[in-house]
């Protein structure tokens, strides 16, 4: 006989994604397709999408970890854009990488210039007894 047919044939192995082979969560196949369709180069090597997916996954995990810490510090269980902003701007390297990026609904970092803070005159206030109350501060309170 010719040897063709359904009997005795080798069973096809279960398909394994390139992401699972590389131990990644990010889609290597999709990154490869986007690299080809994006006209970045005439040809795209097999290792390039794996490397790029790994880098993207690492950066995402780093930002999400810091944002999760910021959410926990604010006693929240859900990460909002404000937490992403705090995470990125408080980290020196991520702030440099994403310096030109605006995060919608992120707000700004709380910051008061030292010049604008009231003067600390603990010695002068204690020595001059002009005030009627003991230890009253000279700062304005409304």
Curated annotation (Swiss-Prot):
Modified residues annotated as N6-lactoyllysine in this record: 10
Pfam families in the record: Histone, Histone_H2A_C
Keywords: Acetylation, Cell cycle, Chromosome, DNA damage, DNA recombination, DNA repair, DNA-binding, Isopeptide bond, Meiosis, Nucleosome core, Nucleus, Phosphoprotein, Ubl conjugation
Statement: the UniProt record of this protein carries the keyword DNA repair: yes
Compartments where located: Nucleus; Chromosome
Entry-annotated residues carrying Phosphoserine: 2, 139
GO biological process terms held by the UniProt record: DNA damage response; DNA recombination; DNA repair; heterochromatin formation; meiotic cell cycle
In-chain residues carrying the UniProt-annotated modification N-acetylserine: 2
Residue(s) carrying Phosphotyrosine: 142
UniProt keyword annotation of Kinase present: no
Motif stretch ([ST]-Q motif): 139-140
Subunit structure, interactors included: The nucleosome is a histone octamer containing two molecules each of H2A, H2B, H3 and H4 assembled in one H3-H4 heterotetramer and two H2A-H2B heterodimers. The octamer wraps approximately 147 bp of DNA. Interacts with numerous proteins required for DNA damage signaling and repair when phosphorylated on Ser-139.
Domain text: The [ST]-Q motif constitutes a recognition sequence for kinases from the PI3/PI4-kinase family.
Task performed by this protein: Variant histone H2A which replaces conventional H2A in a subset of nucleosomes. Nucleosomes wrap and compact DNA into chromatin, limiting DNA accessibility to the cellular machineries which require DNA as a template. Histones thereby play a central role in transcription regulation, DNA repair, DNA replication and chromosomal stability. DNA accessibility is regulated via a complex set of post-translational modifications of histones, also called histone code, and nucleosome remodeling.
Protein name: Histone H2AX
Organism encoding this protein: Danio rerio
Organism classification: Eukaryota, Metazoa, Chordata, Craniata, Vertebrata
